[in-house]
């Protein structure tokens, strides 16, 4: 999908802040979102993501800054006059109505829409979310995933330019949530409506989004594609919030292009990492390595970045295992390994109390300065 720029963005958020008394919920946020993009606001509880969503919907007015939607300044525009629909976490499906009545509820008072046109729009939405066979059923006669699709169809029926989704999949179990993520992506692609998704679930944001804004304490810490925020986080906070990561205090002791040589006291040795132009020799940094980037072996691997250690704990997840390894230098790392072989202990690369080596490619090591 198209990425918004300051000049052509479908949605522009410029220096927006929101205070409730002395508490500042959103701090000087500026974002651009392109037309037809799925854009996620990702963060923990209290980070300001829902407050920002409510300002987009018109339920809250910014204390400072401006919001432009499709070139129009939204200042003073009430919710019912905005080309925006909001889908809440609870779905708010009316239990006394059928599926088709729920979907068509918002169309009853739409000007210029005849009864026949309304029926056609409802039929079109039911077909879009694959609920035509369930049109006459009440909400208690369909599943949680189907209720979620009813809420989505109702939100899209009024043909909004922007759809705001507040934790849309939080009420679903894991398997249904994973399945529904792909349904949402398919429906969005067919309608072309711009989606803004609020979520605390990193996997959900990574799966759904064209781009993600990671928020903390009312501020946007990083904006980028799922690959960018995962593989190239710009701070220790983002690196730790998106997935699991091992972090160590380090010092740059040499630049050996294309690598940096780092002294890492917790590892008891020097290691090589990908060069980062913004750091200087002698600078204190953070070395960060994702668990899946580490390789566990019984024999010492060739090359740099080979660390000896002992397996102190492991968790078996079926397709892979997570190992906690105490290193000879005094530190500890977590490492993921795929269980490629079939069997009991034979499926794992190591067991409790085994002496192992942990290695990693210098290109897989992140050097963070914030």
Q: What are these language model-derived features?
A:
Residues 65-73:
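Conserved ABC transporter NBD signature motif
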Residues 42-44:
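The feature captures the beta-strand-to-loop junction immediately N-terminal to the Walker
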Residues 245, 255-370:
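Non-catalytic connector elements of ABC transporters
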Residues 38, 79-240:
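ABC ATPase nucleotide-binding domains
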Residues 50-53, 150:
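ABC ATPase nucleotide-binding domain helices that frame the ATP-binding cleft
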Residues 57:
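Helix-to-loop junction immediately C-terminal to a conserved catalytic motif
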């Amino acid at each position: 999908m198209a990425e918004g720029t300051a000049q052509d963005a479908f949605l522009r958020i410029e220096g927006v802040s929101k205070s409730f008394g002395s508490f500042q919920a959103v701090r000087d946020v500026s974002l651009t979102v392109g037309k037809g993009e799925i854009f996620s606001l990702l963060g923990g509880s209290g980070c300001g993501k829902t407050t920002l969503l409510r300002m987009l919907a018109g339920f809250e007015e910014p204390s400072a800054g401006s919001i432009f939607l499709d070139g129009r300044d939204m200042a003073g525009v009430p919710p019912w006059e905005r080309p925006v629909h909001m889908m809440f976490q609870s779905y708010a499906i009316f239990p006394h109505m059928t599926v088709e009545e729920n979907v068509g509820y918002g169309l009853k008072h739409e000007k210029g829409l005849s009864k026949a046109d309304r029926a056609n729009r409802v039929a079109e939405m039911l077909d879009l979310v694959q609920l035509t066979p369930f049109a006459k059923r009440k909400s208690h006669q369909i599943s949680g995933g189907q209720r979620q699709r009813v809420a989505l169809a109702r939100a899209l029926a009024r043909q909004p330019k922007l759809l705001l989704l507040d934790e849309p999949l939080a009420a679903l179990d894991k398997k249904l949530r994973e399945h529904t993520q792909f349904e949402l992506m398919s429906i969005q692609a067919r309608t072309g409506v711009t989606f803004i998704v609020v979520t605390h679930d990193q996997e959900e944001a990574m799966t759904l989004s064209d781009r993600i804004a990671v928020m903390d304490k009312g501020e946007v810490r990083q904006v980028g594609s799922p690959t960018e925020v995962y593989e190239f986080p710009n701070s220790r906070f983002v690196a730790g919030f998106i997935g699991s990561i091992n972090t160590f205090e380090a010092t740059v002791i040499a630049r050996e292009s294309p690598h940096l040589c780092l002294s890492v006291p917790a590892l008891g040795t020097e290691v090589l990492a990908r060069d980062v132009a913004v750091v200087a020799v002698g600078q204190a940094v953070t070395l960060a390595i994702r668990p899946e980037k580490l390789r566990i072996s019984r024999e010492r691997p060739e090359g740099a970045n080979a660390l000896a250690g002992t397996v102190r704990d492991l968790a078996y997840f079926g397709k892979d295992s997570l190992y906690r390894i105490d290193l000879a230098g005094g530190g500890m790392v977590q490492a993921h390994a795929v269980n490629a072989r079939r069997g009991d202990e034979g499926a794992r690369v190591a067991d409790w109390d085994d002496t192992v080596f942990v290695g990693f490619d210098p290109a897989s090591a992140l050097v963070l300065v914030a």
